Amino acid sequence: MSEASLERGIAALKEQIDAPVAAFFSSCTHCGMCADACLFHTETGCPTYTPIYKVEPMRRLWEQEYTLLGRAKKALGLSKPITEEELEKWQSKVYNTCTLCGRCSMVCPVGNDITGMIRKMREGMSAGGFAPEGLIGASERAVEIGSPMGVRLPALKAQIKHAEKDTGLAIPMDVEGAEYLVLLSSMEIMNYPEYLHAITRIFHQAGKTWTLCSEAFEATNSGIQIGSSDIAAELVGRVVAAAEKLKVKTVISPECGHAYTAIRWEGPNLVHKEFGFKVQHILEVLDELRAEGLLKTEGIEEAKLTFHDPCQLVRRGGVVEQPRNLLDMIAPNFVEMEDSGVMNWCCGAGGGVSANEDADKVRNKAFNRKKKQLESLDIDVVVTACANCRIQLEDGLEINEMDIPILGLTEMLAEHLKEDKPVEEETS
């Protein structure tokens, strides 16, 4: 690592220290409540995993550069400078033991957005070259190929062909003027192609027009995860360009938490303009179809099941009631987890953690919190609405020898679609 890289990292951290961050540092009471809200701390007992401590280099930089006391301490040699070795050491704290889930921010008694501070810390780490190799590779593939997993258009077309054969329905691509532009995540394309089958059947029944885009089918945003606003903006910009080119009314984010955060909440700020279209998560769209009588189901799931709330979708995205409204249609034996909804515990693999191989050990330890939640319910099935959560849940349950299937909510609903004719589309 060159000195220039360290300088870039420090310069980037300085740029992130705005008025809100300064206020957060000034108002922190060191109460420790954020530690009790973080599953990496609760499941390991490691004090350095306390959320606010993960931004300690940035706090010290703020103190040294922007406070009178800090400048005096620095001049007297009482406050050590930030070094390359320190930032290398901090990489695991910032990237491996934080999923940006937002639970710490929820419990802060003075309202500090600790999650936002850690995101800003990642901006400096990324700019200085201190990001983990796994996320660097994912980000490079996202920019160069269009997918963090390296999924190219031919792979998607192969899945489309299978879905069309299984459903007997045509899947539209690059159709101008459709109501919905549907985005997918690489995980859904490669690991859970049944999601594509499900939305194809659901939109057909509802009589809705939709399309995929060959130039922007990927929803995952590695820029958000690694902490690079430039990369995040480029990836969002591709989706915006596709939506504008195809003149769609709504862009639908898939069952992926950070994809929703990127395009729905951070997107306009990243590209510096208001969208000329709506952005919704697939569950928001399905709940609207339910309310309009366009999502018709039959039969029920007799199994006792629960719902794992994806952090970015529920806690940070506000999509709380929609999945429960949808479950009420088909799941009479649905039970809530303790600490559900906006206070649910993270799966332990979001925010780019799953991309870092050296995070596997601590990630598996963090899963113990979810394990305890599930054991207390004695349920038969777990339903969720995030492909990354789904993979982590499947891995964690397998490691802990817990035989509980994991299902996506969209697919479950599609399995219960009432077989009738689609609503006739309005003609102009």
Residue ranges and their predicted role:
Residues 8-51:
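Long, charged N-terminal interaction/targeting segments
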Residues 28-34, 38, 98-104, 108, ...:
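Short cysteine clusters
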Residues 175-180, 299-305:
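A short, charged/proline- and glycine-enriched loop
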Residues 187-275, 312-329, 335-428:
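Cofactor-cradling patches in redox/metallo enzymes
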Residues 233-239, 285-293:
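Active-site glycine-rich loop that binds ribose-phosphate moieties when present
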